[in-house]
């Protein structure tokens, strides 16, 4: 048996379905800036860089629907559809760009 690595996750064989049965939405996002913008998997999408243009009201309380620890990079002039998933748990958001700093609901 190989040595254990602290924090390592060993999933059961088969396919993992992330965020199953969670509310999602798809938004068209455009980078109007002159620099690339990278958004991480657990960043409150509503509070991303203002050079990203999309329906911010719809994005409130959502994050990217991508695996934890990954990110999406938007190059200048880039426009694409992204899938967002609703935040779960207590649905309180603190930090990021300080636009919420409290409960979402």
UniProtKB/Swiss-Prot annotation:
UniProt keywords, alphabetically = Cytoplasm, Hydrolase
Known InterPro entries for this protein?
A: Urease_beta-like, Urease_betasu_sf, Urease_subunit
One Pfam annotation reads: Urease_beta
Q: Which domain of life is it from?
A: Bacteria
Q: Is Cytoplasm set as a keyword in this record? A: yes
Biological processes per GO annotation: urea catabolic process
Please give the subunit comment from the record. Answer: Heterotrimer of UreA (gamma), UreB (beta) and UreC (alpha) subunits. Three heterotrimers associate to form the active enzyme.
This protein is called what? Urease subunit beta
Give the source species: Prochlorococcus marinus (strain MIT 9313)
Which gene is the coding source of this polypeptide chain?
Answer: ureB
